[in-house]
A protein has these predicted regions:
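Catalytic machinery of carbohydrate-active enzymes
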Residues: 1-213
Length: 213
């Protein structure tokens, strides 16, 4: 499922590239894990609004078409996941045709309608504070390559990352157990359900998960 990176530069992770800036200030060694800290008040607010966990978070939004997994497969995946854990459905609110920041209100609503009766908690994320707080409540995160994926890694969450046309070695989750999936076409429309379900199962127990390098 995983294709080779396009260029030599793309084989170096962005964290490692950024870390080299510190050499000018005497910073040496290897970069550690990313860290971001959720707002305690926002976390408490979310805990009051949603059911008790544990949760698997599924974030569905992506800017580029090649990074969007089809609605039907998200719904199938969520239906299967909800048999073992409650699923927190996350998305960027707004309209898909917004040229500046495509949103997924309609897609999220259709997924909720399709999986009616499953243990799904929809949580729209209108800002970074809400997104970070919601991700912090999850045991595992399934999402396309993008900002939510990197925030999940910075929160120390095991991640199943769905990659389309971006370089894996440069942008994969950093410093956490993860699985990366990408079809040969580099378009998530061609990624079947089965390998995603299998990857989620592999990360069921974070202590047993392996890093993909």
């Amino acid at each position: 499922m995983i294709a080779a990176a396009n260029t030599v530069a793309d084989r170096v992770h962005e964290v490692e590239r950024s870390f080299t800036v510190g050499k000018a200030f005497g910073v040496t060694g290897k970069p550690g894990p990313l860290r971001v800290f959720p707002d305690a008040a926002k976390v408490a607010e979310l805990r009051q609004r949603i059911d008790a966990g544990p949760f698997v978070a599924v974030h569905i939004s992506a800017r580029r078409p090649a990074q969007r997994w089809p609605l039907e497969r998200y719904a199938q995946q969520i239906g299967q996941l909800s048999a073992e854990r409650k699923v927190m459905l996350l998305w960027a609110p707004g309209a898909r045709d917004n040229p500046r920041h495509p949103g997924d209100d309609k897609v999220a609503a259709e997924i909720v309608r399709t999986v009616k009766g499953a243990a799904v908690v929809p949580v729209e994320t209108p800002d970074l504070k809400t997104l970070i707080a919601a991700l912090s409540l999850a045991e595992r995160v399934i999402c396309p390559d993008g900002g939510a994926m990197h925030l999940a890694a910075a929160l120390g969450k095991p991640v199943v990352a769905l990659f389309g046309d971006s370089p894996i070695e440069r942008w994969r989750p950093w410093g956490v157990p993860h699985r990366v999936l990408r079809p040969e076409s580099r378009n998530l429309a061609d990624l079947p359900l089965e390998p995603v379900v299998a990857a989620c199962g592999e990360l069921m127990h974070p202590g047993e998960a392996q890093y993909h390098r």
